[in-house]
Amino acid sequence: MADLIFPIAPGAALAIHVALSAGIVAAIIVVATIIREKRAGARPDVPYESGILPGTPPQGPQNAPYFLIAALFVIFDMEAAILFAWAVAARDAGWVGLIEAAIFIGVLLLALIYLWVDGALDWGGPRQRK
């Protein structure tokens, strides 16, 4: 079917894909170099990690809800990927697939409601959390 739309040799298609990809990467690097903030006295050889410069005193451990929210994001993001795969095959799955997806979404909603009621989604400090 692809031959009907784009009558091109597979090797040429690969070469075009590689050239376009390299061109996009080069364009992003050039634009980033042009529009980046230029600071006087900034040392380009010093690593910059999470907003903390090397040699500064430690700021203590990260707030625990940050990692909890990150873990919950990863979990629910994977569920979105599973639902996307179901949506692609929705016609072939029929009513049985629709019922299975509804049960799956229901379980996800119950888990989200449980986390919400439990306070896992509260970003506040220890005084505000249960």
From Swiss-Prot:
Primary location class: membrane
Membrane topology: Multi-pass membrane protein
Top-tier EC class: translocase
InterPro entries associated with the record: NAD(P)H_OxRDtase_bac/plastid, NADH_UbQ/plastoQ_OxRdtase_su3, NDAH_ubi_oxred_su3_sf
UniProt-annotated location(s): Cell inner membrane
Keywords annotated in UniProt: Cell inner membrane, Cell membrane, Membrane, NAD, Quinone, Translocase, Transmembrane, Transmembrane helix, Transport, Ubiquinone
GO cellular component, as recorded: NADH dehydrogenase complex; plasma membrane
EC code: 7.1.1.-
Cell membrane is among the record's keywords: yes
GO molecular function annotations of the record: NADH dehydrogenase (ubiquinone) activity; NADH:ubiquinone reductase (non-electrogenic) activity; quinone binding
Superkingdom, natural source: Bacteria
Catalysed reactions, as listed in the record: a quinone + NADH + 5 H(+)(in) = a quinol + NAD(+) + 4 H(+)(out)
Pfam families from the UniProt entry: Oxidored_q4
Family: Belongs to the complex I subunit 3 family.
Known function: NDH-1 shuttles electrons from NADH, via FMN and iron-sulfur (Fe-S) centers, to quinones in the respiratory chain. The immediate electron acceptor for the enzyme in this species is believed to be ubiquinone. Couples the redox reaction to proton translocation (for every two electrons transferred, four hydrogen ions are translocated across the cytoplasmic membrane), and thus conserves the redox energy in a proton gradient.
Descriptive protein name: NADH-quinone oxidoreductase subunit A
Native source species: Rhodopseudomonas palustris (strain BisA53)
Lineage, top ranks: Bacteria, Pseudomonadati, Pseudomonadota, Alphaproteobacteria, Hyphomicrobiales
Originating gene: nuoA
